[in-house]
Amino acid sequence: MRQATLYLFFILMLLSACRHDDYIIYSIDEDTGGKTVKSEIVGMYLLNEGNMGSNKCTLDYLDLSGNTETVHYYRNIYAERNPSTVKELGDVGNDLKIHDNKLWMVINCSNKVEVATADSCRRLAKIDIPNCRYIAFDDNYAYVSSYVGPVQISTNTQLGRVYKIDTRTYQKVDSIEVGYQPEELCIVGNKLYVANSGGYRIPQYDHTISIIDLSAFKEEKKIDVADNLHRCRADHYNQLWVSSRGTYNGTPAKLFWLEPDKQGEMTVKDNLPVAVSDMCIVGDSLYFFGVEWSYVKMENEISYGIINVRTHQLITRQLSEAKEIESITLPYGLIVNPVHRDFYIMDAKNYVSSGELLHFHADGTFDWRVWTGDIPAHAVFRMKKQPIYNQ
């Protein structure tokens, strides 16, 4: 009996001594078979949203350095690089950017922004922001859109906010009230433009863009655009491209463009009757895909295309003639290589299991596909030389 007691004591002490060790979840390396091409782009991070409530947001990495003969894809690298982080990245990854050689990840339902080194993906900071959505940067400041209130469908929701963060100290330094359920935001000149959706307030959607003067950090005004705004991107002509998701069962989705008038005030010029779920602007080309529910067919209608941002013309209704693009179940993210114009499409599949990343050459020919985490949605290229701002 005494020997059994001593043996049990020894086992308990051993377990106690080990429990503080970090349990490392190793990333999975997959050879895509694609040929590497050396350029100033050395890699691409991909943020998998993970289904809401599952805490399965993960970060993948595509090695484009050219140090190997073929391109390698690494799944779930954040957990491996940061084994002591509780719950890893969290619940619903909603945006991903690189600024000042740091990787910024907006984790929506975990109410936080995670910051890591862009080269090694080591965690630097966690910034608490309620129901955060998207992020934009101007010099030493980050601007994060936030629904503020809880995740719930109700016409009685509070106005959203934009939080201002010092990128050197990771501290919130200010915030400002905008419209209902603000989504993407972008900067042109000294103005911050915020697309307000009102997505929780069905059927009383918001239909405005908030214009914020960055010097004073004050909202100058709101301009009417359309119901349920989402994407907001700027091109090199200082035009804004803003998507409206419509009302789903009435007003159709459209893409609006805005440009400065003679007084420099941003005004709505016109729209194109296309659904845009995501887009990527490279030069004069706006690549997009749209996923729109059809109440006639009772299924999603998927479309692709390219718009010339200078002429405002839809120049093609496809990105590729390859049969592989037809195999995509649910396109959820798109990114175009700004150097070679090859592009990547993220397929969310059924939302609850692994998605896929598909790579196409600039001419649309299919190259390779790999499995990702759940709901691949946001990607950013890592450059060989990232700009460093004043410290």
Describe the role of every protein-language-model region.
Residues 1-6:
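Positively charged n-region of N-terminal signal peptides that target proteins for export
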Residues 7-8, 314:
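Intrinsically disordered, low-complexity segments enriched in polar/charged small residues
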Residues 14-17:
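C-terminal motif of bacterial Sec signal peptides marking the signal peptidase cleavage site
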Residues 19-391:
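Predominantly soluble domains enriched in secretory-pathway, periplasmic, or organellar proteins
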